[in-house]
């Protein structure tokens, strides 16, 4: 619908004044917004990248990854860091739990010599460091491990047994308000790892909740629920975990999709095993009996041998990955924010843990 000429002039003057006062790009028509196409970083799992709909985790946004103990939360974030570093990005790890294992991180492909690491004394210090790194515009990925370990200064200086109701929730709420805009401006991805707690006295519905209040749930563009669903065995030896990740909230594509993959001890996500499964599913890799073939060439008898062949032939693996991404990501459209619902995820609570 055409706008009146006088209104057009008034609008142009107003836009000019806003840009003069707040800088170029402070207001623009949505169709002209250069950030409409969200840049993403791979999670290290092809099936999870596809479940996310955009091909990975979105830059300039807040992401929450939560789950029970030993479910693979830290492993997943280290795989994201490794993928980002391979693209030449700078990453930081805020180790509030003081439990980061550099030897394990190196095994997962992380360049620990170029990984920024901080072990803050208080929750406020950790969040201020995040904000300073984001405002610098020089850091691309920040991981905070974990929200539950972000202890307010007042609690650290107080006695054990003192009541500090809602302190952590208030601290997180204030930090989210401050961080969201800075992350968007600097196009920095901020990943929070979170733990699960049980609400007492819940008779119906999900008794699980996450720590740190409600602010993180609202500000996060993506929330991932990660669970260990079984063991990977070689004979009688357990060599890894079968893992399921559910996309509980997604502001960049359709939510509630799931991905299942293996996390192998000392190796991380079994990417090439996923590639074989998805290649067969999309008919890019032919399977006849126990034999796997690609473009008429046999690549292995049994999944383990086919996986090993792809590891040894990275150019072919990259070609198959590219074709799988084109097939499975091309038809996925973004959904509006109002279509996103946390109802099937972790229950909301006003309590602070």
Swiss-Prot record:
Keywords: ATP-binding, Cytoplasm, DNA damage, DNA recombination, DNA repair, DNA-binding, Nucleotide-binding, SOS response
Single GO BP term: positive regulation of receptor clustering
Binding-site list for ATP: 67-74
Keyword Hydrolase carried by entry: no
PROSITE patterns listed in its UniProt record: RECA_1 (PS00321), RECA_2 (PS50162), RECA_3 (PS50163)
CDD domains according to UniProt: RecA
SMART domains attached to this UniProt entry: AAA (SM00382)
Gene3D superfamilies assigned to the protein according to its UniProt record, in alphabetical order: P-loop containing nucleotide triphosphate hydrolases
InterPro entries xref list: AAA+_ATPase, DNA_recomb/repair_RecA, DNA_recomb/repair_RecA_CS, P-loop_NTPase, RecA-like_C, RecA-like_N, RecA_ATP-bd, RecA_C_sf
Subcellular location: Cytoplasm
Coiled-coil positions: none
Molecular function as annotated in GO: ATP binding; ATP hydrolysis activity; ATP-dependent DNA damage sensor activity; damaged DNA binding; single-stranded DNA binding
Chief location of this protein within or outside the cell: cytoplasm
UniProt GO cellular component terms: cytoplasm
Superkingdom assignment: Bacteria
Function recorded in the entry: Can catalyze the hydrolysis of ATP in the presence of single-stranded DNA, the ATP-dependent uptake of single-stranded DNA by duplex DNA, and the ATP-dependent hybridization of homologous single-stranded DNAs. It interacts with LexA causing its activation and leading to its autocatalytic cleavage.
Official protein name in the record: Protein RecA
Species annotation: Salmonella typhimurium (strain LT2 / SGSC1412 / ATCC 700720)
Gene: recA
């Amino acid at each position: 619908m055409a706008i009146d000429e006088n209104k057009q002039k008034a609008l142009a003057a107003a836009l000019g004044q806003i840009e003069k006062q707040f800088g170029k790009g402070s207001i623009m028509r949505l169709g002209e917004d250069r950030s409409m196409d969200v840049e993403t970083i791979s999670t290290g799992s092809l099936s999870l990248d596809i479940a996310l709909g955009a091909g990975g985790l979105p830059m300039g946004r807040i992401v929450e990854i939560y789950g029970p103990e030993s479910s693979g939360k830290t492993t997943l974030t280290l795989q994201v860091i490794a993928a980002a570093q391979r693209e030449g990005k700078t990453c930081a790890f805020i180790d509030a739990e003081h439990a980061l294992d550099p030897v394990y991180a190196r095994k997962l492909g992380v360049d620990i010599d170029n990984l920024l690491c901080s072990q803050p004394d208080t929750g406020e210090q950790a969040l201020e460091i995040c904000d300073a790194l984001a405002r610098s515009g020089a850091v691309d990925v920040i991981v905070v491990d974990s929200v539950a370990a972000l202890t307010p200064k007042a609690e650290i200086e107080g006695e054990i047994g003192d009541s500090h109701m809602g302190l952590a929730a208030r601290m997180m709420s204030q930090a989210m308000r401050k961080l969201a805009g800075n992350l968007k401006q600097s196009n920095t991805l901020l990943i929070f790892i979170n733990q699960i707690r049980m609400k007492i006295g819940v008779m119906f519905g999900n008794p699980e909740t996450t720590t740190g209040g409600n602010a993180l749930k609202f500000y996060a563009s993506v929330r991932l629920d990660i669970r260990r669903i079984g063991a990977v065995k070689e004979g009688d030896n357990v060599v890894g975990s079968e893992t399921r990740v559910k996309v509980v909230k997604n502001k960049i594509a359709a939510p509630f999709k799931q991905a299942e993959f293996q996390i192998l001890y000392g190796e991380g996500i079994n990417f090439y095993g996923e590639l074989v499964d998805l290649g067969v599913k999309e008919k890019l890799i032919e399977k006849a009996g126990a034999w796997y073939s690609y473009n008429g060439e046999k690549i292995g008898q049994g999944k383990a041998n086919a996986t090993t062949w792809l590891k040894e032939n990275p150019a072919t693996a990259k070609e198959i990955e590219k074709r799988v991404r084109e097939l499975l990501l091309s038809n996925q459209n973004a959904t509006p924010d109002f279509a996103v619902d946390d109802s099937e995820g972790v229950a909301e609570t006003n309590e602070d843990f």
